[in-house]
């Protein structure tokens, strides 16, 4: 079953994060954060993107102008319900799934929290 598919039960994915990346691509107009279990030989990964700024004539309610999520090849738009970051863990609630990512000991880019705030807005809570 795809991770972002609707289901009557909650799907849970847990993995140890090996790398965290961030980017702000002004030319392509997006903020992005990415987390994976390995830099090159990854089995599990998660990406989130949001436009930096919408153009004057772009529809803010169009799905492709919202929050893009991709996990292990499955994609959804605007399905993220909540994100919680602690010193040891990041928990994403996406549609009917929960993704727990152990970040203990992982180098976190200095812009990670800033970009998370831009991407997730009010969905984000930070503890510690």
Regions picked out by a protein language model, each given a short descriptive name:
Residues 1-41:
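Charge-rich, low-complexity N-terminal segments
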Residues 2-5, 19-25, 55-63, 90-94:
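An extracellular/secretory-lumen and virion-surface interaction module
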Residues 8-13, 48-52, 99-102:
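Generic detection of short hydrophobic beta-strand segments and adjacent strand-loop junctions
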Residues 12-14, 19, 84, 89-93, ...:
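Ser/Thr- (and often Asn-) enriched beta-sheet segments in non-cytosolic proteins
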Residues 31-36, 69-70, 90-94, 101:
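Generic recognition of long tandem-repeat/solenoid scaffolds
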Residues 41-52, 92:
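Broad, structure-driven detector of short, well-ordered beta-strand segments within folded domains
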Residues 52-89:
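Short, internal acidic amphipathic alpha-helical interface segments
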Residues 86, 95-128:
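Mixed-charge, glycine-accented linear interaction segment located at domain edges/termini
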């Amino acid at each position: 079953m795809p991770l972002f598919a609707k289901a009557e039960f909650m799907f849970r994915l847990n993995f140890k994060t090996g790398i965290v990346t961030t980017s702000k691509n002004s030319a392509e107009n997006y903020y992005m954060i990415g987390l994976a279990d390995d830099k090159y030989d990854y089995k599990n990964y998660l990406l989130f993107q949001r436009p930096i700024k919408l153009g004057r004539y772009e529809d803010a309610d169009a799905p492709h102008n919202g929050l893009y999520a991709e996990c292990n090849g499955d994609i959804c738009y605007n399905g993220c319900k909540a994100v919680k970051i602690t010193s040891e863990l990041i928990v994403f609630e996406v549609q009917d799934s929960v993704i727990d990512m152990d970040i203990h000991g992982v180098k976190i880019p200095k812009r990670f929290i800033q970009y998370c705030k831009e991407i997730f807005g009010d969905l984000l809570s930070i503890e510690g």
